[in-house]
C-alpha cells in the first residue's frame, strides 16, 4: 500500500471520502515525514497541534456527510502568507517574532474548504531569490541529487521550501507566490507542477509584498490535477485587494480532460537563447511533438521585446520593493535594534534585519526611483513592459491559444555554486519566466523529463489572461505523454 504522505492530493481526497483512512491519520503521516526530513529545512515552523485539531474537525465533517472540497487534505503554506497566531517571517530576520492577528485571503479560503495546515515553508528572504539561499532561517535543500553525487542542490526560489516539501512528500500541495518565476522555476527544479495564475486571479491581501504589480499567489503540487484542485480554492474576488479581479472561478479540474485538439500552440523564436543546453532544446522540441500528436497545431511566433524583459524586470521589481520594504522599521512589530535616536533605531534595525540580497534590491530600487534617474531607468522599464504585453496580445490575436517554452535555462545547480558569481548570473535563471509577470499572464510549469544527470526539467505553457483552463488542458497532455517523474530514494530519512 502507498504511504499516506505519498498519495496525490486527488487520491487522498478520494480516500478520505471513501473512509479508507482518517484525516488525523494522513495528517500524522505528513507530520512524521516532516520530522524525518529536517535535513531539507523545507519548513521554518511546523504546526503539529494545529494540524491535528484541524484534522479532527475534518473527520467530524466527513462522518456527518458534510465534507468540504479540500476536507482533511494537509498543505504547507509559504511563509509569505500571513497566518493568524502563527509565526510569519517572509524568511527575514526583521520579522523575527511576528505573529499576525489576521489571516491571508488565500489561506483563509483553503481553511474554509477544509484543508489542514502543516506549517510554514521556507523561502528566499522577502521572496527575493532564485535558489532559496537567501533565507535568514537557513537554506532549503532539494530532495533531488545528481546521479552518483552527494552534492546538495538548490530547490529553486523563491518558493523553494514549497517545491521541496511537495517533491519530498512533506505535504500534498503548497501555496507559493510568483513575482518573476518563483513558482515555475522551483517547480521545474524539483519535478513538481506549479502555476502562476493571471494577475488578479488570487487575492494578494495578507501576502507580504515584494513587487505589488507583479506578485501573484498560486499552488505547487505533484500533478496537474492537484494544482487545478488547489487553484479552485485559492482563486476568487476579494474586495480588500484593489488588484483582485471580479471574474467567475471556473472548474479548473474539469478542464484537464479537454485535450488540445484544435488548439494552436506558439513557439517563440526569441526564447532560443544563446548557450541553451542541447537537452533543453530537445525537451522543448519533444513537448511540441507531444502537443502536435495530441491534435494541436504548432507554429513559430515572434515576441520581439523578449530580450529587454530581464533588465526591465530588475528595474521595476526592485523599485517596488524599495517602497514596500520601507515599512519595516522596528517600530510596530518584528526586530528592533536600539539607536541613539529614532533615525538611529531605523538604521540599526534595517541594517541588522535585512539580508544582503534584500539590501541590494532596495538600493537598486531607490537608485532607479531617484530624481536624476527616474526617467532614464524606471520610466523606460515601464515602457518596455507595455511593449512586452503588446507582443503577447498580438500573438493571441493572431490565433495562438497558448505558448510553449522551456521553464528554466538549466536543471538545478548546487548549493553555493553561484555564491561567487556576478548577481546577474543568478538573475538569468528567470530569463524564461519574467515576461509572464511583466504582462500579467498565467503560466504553468510541468515536469517533462530528466537531464543527463537525472535531474528534472520542466516545460512552461503561457496562456491568455484568465484562461488557466487551456493551460491545464495542455499541461495534462504533456504530463500524460511524459509520465509522472518519480523522486529518487529518500536519502534524508
UniProtKB/Swiss-Prot annotation:
The GO biological-process annotations, alphabetized, read as: translation
* GO molecular function terms noted in the UniProt entry: ATP binding; glutaminyl-tRNA synthase (glutamine-hydrolyzing) activity
Q: Where is the active site?
A: 78, 158, 182
Q: Supply the alphabetized keyword list.
A: ATP-binding, Ligase, Nucleotide-binding, Protein biosynthesis
* Family matches, as InterPro entries: Amidase, Amidase_CS, Amidase_dom, AS_sf, GatA
Keyword ATP-binding found: yes
Its Enzyme Commission number(s) read 6.3.5.7
Q: Which reaction does it catalyse?
A: L-glutamyl-tRNA(Gln) + L-glutamine + ATP + H2O = L-glutaminyl-tRNA(Gln) + L-glutamate + ADP + phosphate + H(+)
Query: What sections of the sequence does the record tag as coiled-coil?
Result: none
Gene3D superfamilies linked to this entry? Amidase signature (AS) domain (3.90.1300.10)
> Which GO terms of the cellular component aspect does the record hold?
glutamyl-tRNA(Gln) amidotransferase complex
- Family the entry assigns: Belongs to the amidase family. GatA subfamily.
- What is this protein for, i.e. what is its function? Allows the formation of correctly charged Gln-tRNA(Gln) through the transamidation of misacylated Glu-tRNA(Gln) in organisms which lack glutaminyl-tRNA synthetase. The reaction takes place in the presence of glutamine and ATP through an activated gamma-phospho-Glu-tRNA(Gln).
The record describes its quaternary structure and partners as:
Heterotrimer of A, B and C subunits.
In Swiss-Prot or TrEMBL terms, this protein is called: Glutamyl-tRNA(Gln) amidotransferase subunit A
What is the organism of origin for this protein?
A: Methylorubrum populi (strain ATCC BAA-705 / NCIMB 13946 / BJ001) (Methylobacterium populi)
Amino acid at each position: 500500500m502507498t504511504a499516506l504522505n505519498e498519495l496525490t492530493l486527488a487520491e487522498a481526497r478520494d480516500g478520505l471520502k471513501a473512509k479508507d483512512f482518517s484525516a488525523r491519520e494522513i495528517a500524522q503521516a505528513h507530520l512524521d515525514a516532516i520530522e524525518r526530513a529536517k535535513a531539507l529545512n523545507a519548513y521554518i515552523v511546523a504546526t503539529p497541534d494545529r494540524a491535528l485539531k484541524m484534522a479532527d474537525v475534518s473527520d467530524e465533517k466527513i462522518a456527518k456527510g458534510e465534507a468540504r472540497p479540500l476536507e482533511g487534505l494537509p498543505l504547507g503554506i509559504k511563509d509569505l502568507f500571513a497566518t493568524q497566531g502563527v509565526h510569519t517571517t517572509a524568511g527575514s530576520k526583521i520579522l523575527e517574532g511576528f505573529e499576525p492577528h489576521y489571516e491571508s485571503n488565500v489561506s483563509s479560503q483553503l481553511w474554509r474548504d477544509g484543508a489542514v495546515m502543516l506549517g510554514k515553508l521556507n523561502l528566499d528572504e522577502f521572496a527575493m531569490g532564485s535558489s532559496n539561499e537567501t533565507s535568514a532561517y537557513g537554506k532549503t535543500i532539494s530532495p533531488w541529487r545528481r546521479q552518483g553525487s552527494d552534492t546538495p542542490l538548490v530547490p529553486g526560489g523563491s518558493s523553494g521550501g514549497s517545491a521541496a516539501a511537495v517533491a519530498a512528500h512533506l505535504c500534498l500541495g503548497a501555496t507559493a507566490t510568483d513575482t518573476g518565476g518563483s513558482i515555475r522555476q522551483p517547480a521545474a527544479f524539483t519535478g513538481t507542477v506549479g502555476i502562476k495564475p493571471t494577475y488578479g486571479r488570487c487575492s494578494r491581501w495578507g501576502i507580504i509584498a515584494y513587487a505589488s504589480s507583479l506578485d501573484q499567489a498560486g499552488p505547487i503540487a505533484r500533478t496537474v490535477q492537484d494544482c487545478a484542485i488547489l487553484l479552485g480554492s485559492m482563486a476568487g474576488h476579494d474586495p480588500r485587494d484593489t488588484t483582485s479581479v471580479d471574474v467567475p472561478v471556473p472548474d479548473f479540474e474539469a478542464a484537464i480532460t479537454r485535450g488540445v485538439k484544435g488548439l494552436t500552440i506558439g513557439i517563440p523564436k526569441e526564447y532560443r537563447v544563446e548557450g541553451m543546453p542541447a537537452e533543453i532544446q530537445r525537451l522543448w522540441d519533444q513537448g511540441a511533438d507531444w502537443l502536435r500528436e495530441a491534435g494541436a497545431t504548432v507554429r513559430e511566433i515572434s515576441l520581439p521585446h523578449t530580450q529587454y524583459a530581464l533588465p526591465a524586470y530588475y528595474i521595476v521589481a526592485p523599485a517596488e520593493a524599495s517602497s514596500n520594504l520601507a515599512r519595516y522599521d522596528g517600530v510596530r512589530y518584528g526586530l528592533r535594534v536600539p539607536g541613539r535616536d529614532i533615525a538611529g533605531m531605523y538604521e540599526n534595525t534595517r541594517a541588522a534585519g535585512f539580508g544582503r540580497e534584500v539590501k541590494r534590491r532596495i538600493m537598486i530600487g531607490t537608485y532607479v526611483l531617484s530624481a536624476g534617474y527616474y526617467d532614464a531607468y524606471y520610466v523606460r522599464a515601464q515602457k518596455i513592459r507595455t511593449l512586452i504585453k503588446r507582443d503577447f496580445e498580438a500573438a493571441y490575436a493572431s490565433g495562438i491559444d497558448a505558448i510553449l517554452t522551456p521553464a528554466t535555462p538549466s536543471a538545478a545547480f548546487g548549493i553555493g555554486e553561484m555564491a561567487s558569481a556576478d548577481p546577474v548570473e543568478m538573475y538569468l535563471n528567470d530569463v524564461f519566466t519574467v515576461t509572464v509577470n511583466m504582462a500579467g499572464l498565467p503560466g504553468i510549469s510541468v515536469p517533462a523529463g530528466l537531464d543527463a544527470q537525472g535531474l528534472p526539467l520542466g516545460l512552461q505553457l503561457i496562456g491568455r489572461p484568465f484562461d488557466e483552463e487551456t493551460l491545464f488542458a495542455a499541461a495534462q497532455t504533456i504530463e500524460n505523454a511524459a509520465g509522472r517523474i518519480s523522486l529518487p530514494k529518500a536519502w534524508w530519512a
